[in-house]
Amino acid sequence: MRTKTLSLFDSFYGKISPSMFYRTIAAIYLFDFLDRLRARKYPRDWYSILERELDGLISNFSFFDRSFDFSANDFAAWSETDKNFDIEKKTGKVYFDLWKNFGKEEFFAQALSALKDRFEKNGISVSSVNDALDDGCGSGRYSFALKRLGCARVKGIDISAEAIELARRMSPFPADEVSFTQGSVLKLPFGDESFDFIFSNGVLHHTKDDKKGLKEIYRMLKDSGRCWLYLYGGKESLFWDIVDLCRKLLSTVPQGYTQSLMRDMGYPPGRIFHRTDFFYVPLNKRYFASEVEAMLKDTGFGNFKRLKRGVQYDWDEIIYENPGIDPYIFGEGEMRYLVSKK
């Protein structure tokens, strides 16, 4: 099925105009296909549905070409010139440009609710944690959630100076309880065995050296400590094949244009974040469970458990609630682990 789907995507890509507008609409439409599948309870004939939808989208674009004159439109104002960039800093900028659009209530509430649900469903408590690290904290949403869920002290670190400044500005806690530092998750400015709990949530798969990032976590984790590790799973799944096609479509479309178009279409900040994350972050490595577990063993971690429950939109929860789902759609699911040294 994957070979057939990739062939369909190649054919579709060849029919799309180079227009920024068409390419962006196509990418948004493709990504949303998974939401439409979810609404239909992931039917087994999803491929036929996808084929019909892509044919319909091409027909709609032909209608636009006949009905509107795009020839005089100027997209130069959206052009980007940063073709040579540092991957870590570019990643930080992509996320900062997304986080800054969240309202304060959405900023706090969604992260707290999601993390509380994930912890409870997987039997995890942080109420006895003294020192926690949010490793790649971004704007601090999960740092604040960890504090509210019981951690006595939380430190956050991120490569983006703008994100750290935003986190400090949004923090409702005194600095001796929640603090933020700019720095790389590949070279952390903290001493050995400094933390009881390290939260690495969707970070290392965006770095150039995930193994080095794991070694830093191992170095800083106390012997009795635990690490929450989330890496992208579902390698070679329909989800990632759609993402790769979207990234190809948007390779010449600036992030700001895509975000603006989604805002004009009525997408709320959370949905814009979720899509733009996958569309524009420079690196998004994917893993099989065997690859993650081999890395953990090579790093020296002696104990790890894969976590298979989550909030309603987590792949693992979708797979749990839909046991008949085609395994190609999300592959092995997401790679969430609770890890310790012993």
Summary of predicted features, one role per range:
Residues 5-100:
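N-terminal, positively charged/glycine-rich alpha-helical extensions of SAM-dependent methyltransferases
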Residues 105-128, 145:
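Conserved alpha-helix/loop element of class I SAM-dependent methyltransferases that forms part
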Residues 133, 139-186:
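Class I SAM-dependent methyltransferase SAM/SAH-binding core
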Residues 186-197:
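A short acidic, Gly/Pro-enriched loop at the edge of an enzyme's catalytic core
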Residues 197-208:
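A short SAM/SAH-binding and catalytic strip from SAM-dependent methyltransferases
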Residues 211-223:
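A short glycine-rich, Lys/Arg-flanked "PGG" loop and its adjoining helix->strand segment in the class I
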Residues 226-258:
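Conserved class I S-adenosyl-L-methionine
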Residues 275-291:
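Acceptor-substrate binding/catalytic loop of class I
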